[in-house]
């Protein structure tokens, strides 16, 4: 079974970009998408992906709030979560990494940076 990546982001442009990158460079990786934190949590519980990519600003929650919910849910607590955000200030990065994020990828990112992130966690 191919590894699955769950991308929690409400931006259709970002979702399309990640889908195109995976379609070209990681055809063995299944992409699951969720536009809200609650949808993402539900999808993570049901699908148990190998990696979760999480936007820091969602319509219903912050990345930190979703990260906390994922960490406190037994079936998702061990899934690595990488925050993807345009807010890459050091205090934000430190807060999210301290809150349990396995990594942080600043927007805009390059294709090699994105692929390296996948390779690190899948």
Q: What do the PLM-derived regions correspond to, one by one?
A:
Residues 2-13, 18-22, 52:
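Conserved acidic segment of CheY-like receiver
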Residues 33-51:
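Acidic, metal-coordinating helix/loop segments flanking the phosphotransfer/catalytic sites
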Residues 36-39, 62-68:
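Acidic catalytic/metal-coordinating carboxylates
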Residues 59, 77, 89:
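The feature encodes the CheY-like receiver
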Residues 65, 88-103, 116:
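Alpha4 helix (beta4-alpha4-beta5 surface) of REC/receiver domains from two-component response regulators
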Residues 109-118:
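C-terminal output helix
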């Amino acid at each position: 079974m191919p590894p699955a990546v769950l991308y929690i982001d409400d931006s259709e442009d970002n979702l399309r970009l990640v889908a195109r990158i995976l379609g070209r460079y990681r055809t063995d990786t299944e992409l699951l998408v969720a536009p809200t934190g609650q949808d993402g949590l539900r999808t993570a519980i049901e699908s148990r992906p190998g990696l979760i990519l999480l936007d820091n600003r969602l319509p219903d929650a912050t990345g930190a709030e979703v990260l906390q919910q994922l960490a406190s849910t037994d079936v998702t607590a061990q899934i690595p979560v990488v925050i993807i955000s345009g807010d890459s200030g050091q205090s934000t990065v430190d807060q999210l990494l301290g809150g349990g994020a396995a990594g942080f990828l600043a927007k805009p990112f390059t294709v090699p940076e994105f692929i390296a992130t996948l390779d690190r966690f899948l």
